[in-house]
Amino acid sequence: MFSFAGEQDSISSDQPTEDPDSPRNRLSETTSPYLLQHQHNPVHWYPWGEEAFEAAREQNKPIFLSIGYSTCYWCHVMERECFEDQEVADWMNKFFISVKVDREERPDIDEIYMTAVQLITRGRGGWPISLFLEPETLKPIWGGTYFPKGRFISLMKQIQDKWVSDVKAILTQANQIADAIVGRLSLIQETIPISPEIIEKGTSSLLSRFDDNLGGFSGSPKFPMPMYNDFLMETSWDNLQVQKAVKKTLDSMFMGGMYDQVGGGFHRYSTDAKWLVPHFEKMLYDNGQLVSTYARAYELTGEPTYATVVEETLEYVNRELSASEGGFYSAQDAETNHLEGETYLWRELQIREALEEADMANEVSFTLSLYGVDGGTNFQDPHHKEEAPTNVLFLTNHPNVLASKYKLSYPEFQAKVDAVDKALLTVRDTRDQPTTDDKIITAWNGMMIAGYADAGRIMQNNSWVERAMEAANFILSDMKLENGKLLRTWREGKGGAEAFLIDYASLIHGLLAIYRANENKKMLEDAIVLYEKARELFYVSGEGWYDTEKGKSDLFVRTRALSDGAIPAATSFILGDQVNLLEFTGDNTYLEDALETINSESQWLNAQPLAVLVAAKHVDRLMKSHPDKFGSEPNSFVEKDSTVNMSCEPKTLELSAGESATIIVTLEMERGWHVNANVTGNEYTIPLSFTSIDDNLVLEIDWPKSEQMISGGEKVYVFGSTVTIPITLNLKQQSKGNMSIMARWQSCNEKACLAPEEKMVPCRVVVE
């Protein structure tokens, strides 16, 4: 394979934005905010479509393809450096047919050509995508991501020279790249039995990547990856290491600058390992998924800070991403006035002035300490070194610890913070604001709908469920065609391209989340209708689900991408829909469909569960509810639900540092069953134990007298029928968050033992 230009650069320069009164190109006829940003470029841009393809074929020119999105920082940089530059435009217009694609409107095109970039650059990817295509088949010749002016002109010259002198070699290379893409995105693999170890394998893979000090499952940059925490919470929550990993990660994320401390909502990712300095764009799909994640974490832990994150994020979405029609907008830009994060950054003087203006001068010291501003600046724009250093706001400690520091209850502390944030937000709103991409995307709305519904159900806020229904009804009425097909996008009263599998699957996910929250039958009925339409359009028996409809002439491959990214794979989403429809309807047709879906990605599930954790989470649900449908080897334990009912009194216990209190834990066994005692007398049996998740909480257990019995010819000590265990809790020092206690036991009868169980003691320990 031959190559063209050298390494891509990552330099930046500012050039004046084009005059809005200058002549417009063909992009002015589109509705995409991203394409409309380029309508005044001197480049003769075409939108993706037959007009562009025919022009390239008739003129015998390669196609230059640029793929990006409206809130992409480096897309803006390349526009300023290249596409607004007349010299670059002259080259593009003379030797190429230039095509612009909004990746959010056409995820199918983005998937194909991002794979091409990763193949060409040996794994590197990102936006903008900059590729040259052979015009007859639309196969990629060469390309990369961001190119500055000099290298871009050099690359265009090399492509043009090769096109004239050796087009045969170019076509050969295009075919080779395309074959590799087809092998990666459309390969049909042989079905193999699902191993029951995929959950353990996925869990251990995540825990091996866990950052004990800072939270998260990678080094820098750190992405939120809500599906990681969701997987751990749903499949392995009884594991103490899992609980610590999830809580540390969720705490670190909302305490850092990646969370908008003043306005709520999460930025795209953290540029560092500390979750401190974000890439400042905000995406609907991140916030929709993270609302569900934090709501679920609140449900499992009772931690009030997670509820606060949910409330603040939904307030942000209501305020800044809600469309008057009923749906949700897509995203907000990373930059303001060509400066990344300008709207969100603060200097000490600005904070003082904002609070003084709100008659809150007495809160200045508190605020500077709260958000780390009194420790000096922490942000220097890497692209504009001439700008003075400033501050990304972050929490200097966990809110529970800070509340204790100020001798406040958590609600009192949060009310104090809310008042400060309101004053800062009032001033911030007077600044120039990042651009909002105001198109409505069905798939992303599905995730946000689920976020509202999940939060409303868990936190018992019916208004959130109603907001989810409002968005769902808008899509079902305005973005659904008479033939039953969905539209992918909507903007200013106009629909865009038809939807893809991810749109159907995600919207069904949202509808079923509403149904789980309020049992609205219409939501369930609409979900069933959409599922049948999706099955008609995207499913092929014996092959699985495809991302696109068949017969698309502008695609040289019909993709079926299985791995999760920032958004779960469409196949993973549809599997979850099948499992939920099975649960809600009892119709075994959905079970059969789910098993076929699992078969289609069985090799991925067994070999790389970390890449398909969303699917693995749903497989785990089916393994538990329908173990007979999976061909795993029987293990040495009896397959049976728990025989033990655990209760605790009091249900809620309040503790302060240095205090002690006692809870009573009661285990009631089914008739004929017992649990092994705390000392079993047999090395092959699992003893009953209780463990504090927080080292600051010390347990003193008053073990009752056990019974002796003979099992397998050997003595073993057990607790039978009912056992009551007093446990004294000693809080050594102030800790952050509420605390939990884990119980572990093994149930046995005269013939067999069950697998060991780990469950949370149903007592809530509230740290005052």
For each predicted feature, which ranges?
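Replace the tail clause
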Residues: 2-447, 451, 457, 595-634
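Extended, hydrophobic alpha-helical segments in both membrane/secreted and soluble proteins
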Residues: 68-75, 266, 287-290, 294, ...
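Glycine-rich, acidic and aromatic/proline-enriched surface loops and short helix-turn segments
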Residues: 252-259, 470-478
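Short linear capping/connector segments at secondary-structure termini
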Residues: 268-274, 331-335, 485-495, 549-554, ...
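Long, polar/charge-rich, low-hydrophobicity segments
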Residues: 319-322, 477, 482-504, 510-645
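Extracellular/lumen-exposed scaffold segments
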Residues: 379, 591, 608-768
